[in-house]
UniProtKB/Swiss-Prot annotation:
Lineage, uppermost ranks: Bacteria, Bacillati, Actinomycetota, Actinomycetes, Kitasatosporales
Function: NDH-1 shuttles electrons from NADH, via FMN and iron-sulfur (Fe-S) centers, to quinones in the respiratory chain. The immediate electron acceptor for the enzyme in this species is believed to be a menaquinone. Couples the redox reaction to proton translocation (for every two electrons transferred, four hydrogen ions are translocated across the cytoplasmic membrane), and thus conserves the redox energy in a proton gradient.
Main subcellular localisation: membrane
Organism: Streptomyces avermitilis (strain ATCC 31267 / DSM 46492 / JCM 5070 / NBRC 14893 / NCIMB 12804 / NRRL 8165 / MA-4680)
One BP term from GO: ATP synthesis coupled electron transport
Membrane-spanning residues: 3-23, 28-48, 59-79
Keyword Membrane: yes
Pfam families xrefs: Oxidored_q2 (PF00420)
Underlying gene: nuoK1
The name this protein goes by in its record: NADH-quinone oxidoreductase subunit K 1
Domain of life (superkingdom): Bacteria
InterPro entries named among the record's database cross-references: NADH_UbQ_OxRdtase_chain4L/K, NUOK/Mnh_C1-like
Subcellular compartments: Cell membrane
Recorded GO CC terms: NADH dehydrogenase complex; plasma membrane
Gene3D superfamilies: 1.10.287.3510
UniProt keyword terms in alphabetical order: Cell membrane, Membrane, NAD, Quinone, Translocase, Transmembrane, Transmembrane helix, Transport
Length: 99
């Protein structure tokens, strides 16, 4: 398959994720859409890496996955804390949390 097709797929996935972040109000769905956007960026990095014949994009994608794993841990902890205190996972309730 042509690497340009992977770039089209990455653009489509990123657009779906960005639309989900802008439209949805549930924190878990927004969080999943952000992860979809990160995976679309990883796909673009790997496609550009394959297109140019070097490993730089694949290394960046690997480190992005490591950072995304840490983000999942912190993000889900915040969402669980929000749900326990407000009994809702709405993004609008996040502004009511105390520091």
């Amino acid at each position: 398959m042509n690497p340009v097709n992977y770039l089209y797929l990455a653009a489509l996935l990123f657009t779906i994720g960005a639309t989900g972040v802008l439209i949805r109000r549930n924190a878990i769905v927004v969080f999943m859409c952000v992860e979809l956007m990160l995976n679309a960026c990883n796909l673009a990095f790997v496609a550009f890496s394959r297109l140019h014949g070097n490993l730089d994009g694949q290394i960046i994608a690997f480190f992005t996955m490591v950072v995304a794993a840490a983000e999942v841990v912190v993000g889900l902890a915040i969402i669980v804390s929000l749900f326990r205190s407000r009994h809702s996972a709405s993004v609008d309730d996040a502004s009511l949390m105390k520091l």
